[in-house]
């Protein structure tokens, strides 16, 4: 009887420790607040990377970064998992032409409420640079091929 209670209690502790973390995300995704994130170690153009994310999970897009805390989380995940110094990582920010004006927009439709841009807007797509520990956003040509990170709203 004592062994049964011990095992049951152990399973309860494991279950409770998983709930609210990455337990609601697919097994190969990380969790931060209400979102799930996945690093994709394939080289793709910005457009192909966005399409890949959208094909993975309903509602997934290239990662949008909406706060300093989220930027720190994303940089930490990338620093721990991307060991090559050769490639940068696509984010979902791009410059969109609207008639005579250009504006920056996230591919998931969220508003640009946090920015960490380094270069002026001469190209259309953005990467996180490995050389800045994935903390600075650089404007590059969308046709380049980079690794990328996908993000989606965790199901409730």
From Swiss-Prot:
One of its GO terms (cellular component) is extracellular region. It comes from the Eukaryota. Disulfide bonds join 25-36, 53-150, 125-142. Expressed by the venom gland. Pfam families: Lectin_C (PF00059). Keywords: Disulfide bond, Hemostasis impairing toxin, Secreted, Signal, Toxin. Its main location: secreted. The keyword S-adenosyl-L-methionine does not apply. Residues 1-23 form the signal peptide. It is found in: Secreted. GO terms for molecular function: toxin activity. The keyword Transmembrane does not apply. Residues 32-151 form the C-type lectin domain. Changing residue 6 to F: In subunit alpha-2 and subunit alpha-3. InterPro entries: C-type_lectin-like, C-type_lectin-like/link_sf, C-type_lectin/snaclec_domain, C-type_lectin_CS, CTDL_fold. Interferes with one step of hemostasis (modulation of platelet aggregation, or coagulation cascade, for example). Heteromultimer; disulfide-linked. Belongs to the snaclec family. PANTHER family: MANNOSE, PHOSPHOLIPASE, LECTIN RECEPTOR RELATED. This is Snaclec stejaggregin-B subunit alpha.
